[in-house]
C-alpha cells in the first residue's frame, strides 16, 4: 500500500505548479520544495468532522484516520469544501485489520464502498479511483494483532478478495 500511495502522491505533486498540502493526522507525506506549502493537523485535536481550515489546498491526505472518525461523512464533506478545483484527496483506511481504538474505531470500506462514500461527500464518481491491497496470509498473520513484515515469511502478492487496506484518490 505505501508503495502505491507514494507513487500516487508523487504523480500528483509532479503535475502541480504549486502544491498546497493538508495532511490530516500524519506527517509521513511532508512534501518539501520551493513551490510547496505543507499544513498538518491532528485528530482529535483538530476535529475534521466539525471544522474546516481556510486555505486553498490542492492536495489533502488522510492516511489511516477516517476509520477513527465518529462522523466520516461530515469529515468527507469538509474535505471537499477545503479542496480547490482542481484538487486531489488521497484517503486510505484499513479493512481486514484488527480493531484499534485510537480513541475509537468505527468504520471500514471496501473499494466499492469507498467510492460511494466519496461520491456522497461531493466527489464525481467518474473522478474517483479506488484500490486495495491484502492477501489471505497477511490476514491470518495479523491474528490476533498486527505483526512486523518479514520478507521471508510474508507475501506481498495482492488478492483483491482479502483487502487489508483500501485507498482512493478523488479528483475535484
What is the predicted role of each segment?
Residues 1, 5, 57, 110:
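Hydrophobic (often cysteine-bearing) scaffold residues that line and stabilize catalytic clefts
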Residues 1-39, 129, 137-153, 161-169:
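N-terminal accessory regions of S-adenosyl-L-methionine
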Residues 70-80, 84-172:
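S-adenosyl-L-methionine-dependent methyltransferase catalytic module, highlighting the catalytic core
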Residues 10-100, 111-115, 168-171:
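Conserved SAM-binding loop
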Amino acid at each position: 500500500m505505501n508503495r502505491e500511495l507514494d507513487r500516487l502522491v508523487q504523480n500528483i505533486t509532479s503535475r502541480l505548479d504549486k502544491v498546497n498540502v493538508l495532511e490530516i493526522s500524519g506527517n509521513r507525506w511532508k512534501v518539501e520544495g520551493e513551490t510547496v506549502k505543507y499544513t498538518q493537523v491532528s485528530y482529535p485535536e483538530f476535529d475534521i468532522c466539525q471544522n474546516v481550515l481556510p486555505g486553498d489546498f490542492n492536495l489533502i491526505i488522510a492516511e489511516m484516520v477516517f476509520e477513527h472518525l465518529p462522523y466520516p461523512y461530515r469529515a468527507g464533506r469538509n474535505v471537499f469544501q477545503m479542496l480547490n478545483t482542481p484538487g486531489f484527496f488521497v484517503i486510505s483506511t484499513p479493512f481486514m485489520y484488527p480493531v484499534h481504538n485510537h480513541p475509537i474505531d468505527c468504520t471500514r470500506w471496501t473499494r466499492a464502498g469507498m467510492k460511494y462514500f466519496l461520491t456522497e461527500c461531493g466527489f464525481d464518481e467518474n473522478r474517483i479511483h479506488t484500490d486495495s491491497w491484502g492477501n489471505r496470509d497477511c490476514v491470518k498473520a495479523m491474528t490476533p494483532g498486527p505483526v512486523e513484515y518479514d520478507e521471508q515469511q510474508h507475501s506481498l502478492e495482492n488478492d483483491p478478495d482479502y483487502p487489508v487496506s483500501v485507498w482512493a484518490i478523488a479528483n475535484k
